[in-house]
Amino acid sequence: MPQHLSSPQLVILSPAAYPGSADGAIDPVGHGTGAFILKQANGSSGATLERNDKYWGTKATAPGIDVTYVPDGAARANALRTDTADIVEAVPVAQVGNIDKNLLHEVATPRTSTLYLNTRSGPFADPALRAAARNAVDPAALIKTVFEGHADLPVGLLGPAVPWAAELRAWKKETYPGASGAAATGKVPGATAAGTVPAGTAITLASYTDRPELGEMVPLLAQQLEAAGFKVTQDVREYNQIESEALAGKFHAVLVSRSTVLDSGDAVAYMTADFSSSGSYSMSGLHDEKVDAAISKAAATQPGDERRKAIMAAEQAILVSGAAIPLAHERVIQGEASGVTGAQRDPGERALITSATTVKK
């Protein structure tokens, strides 16, 4: 069940929330058995929840929750700084220096900034040039400049938020890409050796502005690739303007922020969507029999140690294919005002306010 019903999009509602007729609307307001009950939903602006005094578990300490949806990162940070919000999700890295560090808490997330290479056509149809790009990137410089140190070096597709992953890798916790990375120095079994980039090899590097750090990363990443001999054209737009083109293979490389276990709680779903021959989110267009076999084996293995081993074997097969280059394991910076206790710091970004959360002013 956890691997099938972990996504908030797959929430199971109270029978009372469902309409009596086929054309009726689902209405979750006022229904539910959790510690808090949704009392008012204000579209995209916010929501109000009240403590459920009939809750079957530990009664919530807080009488309720007033939620405000604030898409602007600077505005979220300002709400914490001015003490107009008690808990703030996703404080932007650029705002960290303006806030009391005692109010900020970093949480490793199962989200990786990843460069997908188009294996269908163009320069990156050549595995040796994919390896050249892998060796050309400098993730430490990207993390220092763009994330201001608030991210982890990329050891693979799965980062430190998946704590069991590292010990099942041949290269453990060593950084995967880069000139001195595990792949370039022979520590990744089966990794392709980098080829020489032919003069004038032109590529288009695409990303999106919805996550500011990606837009900031693109020019630096372009410089790193150009130093290896690639001629890079940058194309950065809003996500909804590039997704269809990226999936259709219109770009040679696409930089994305990808959640690896968030939707299902299990990495197999992500690997299937992104890297199998039948994948629904295959920006690299990978068709690799070894990768397909490894993913299929992981999918067929029962949850537990053997499934974890199979997942890591699939990760290695994907990395060896060169279809994707991990660049940074992202962290979320959670803001908690003075007086807040018991807030959940959840790598899966599912739990935040619990029965134990309190605010004392």
Model-derived features with residue positions:
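Surface-exposed binding/hinge segments that line
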Residues: M1-Y18
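Alpha-helical secondary-structure segments
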Residues: G34-A35, P63-G64, T82, P110-V155, ...
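Short, well-ordered beta-strand elements
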Residues: G34-K39, A47-T48, P63-Y69, I87, ...
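Ligand-site clamp/hinge motif
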Residues: G46, N52-N98
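Structural transition elements
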Residues: G149-A193, R211-E216
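Ligand/substrate-recognition segments at binding pockets and active sites
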Residues: A191-T260
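Extracytoplasmic/peripheral linker and loop segments enriched in polar/acidic and small residues
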Residues: T233-Q234, Y239-I242, T272-A337
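Long beta-strand-rich cores associated with HINT superfamily self-processing modules
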Residues: Q334-K361
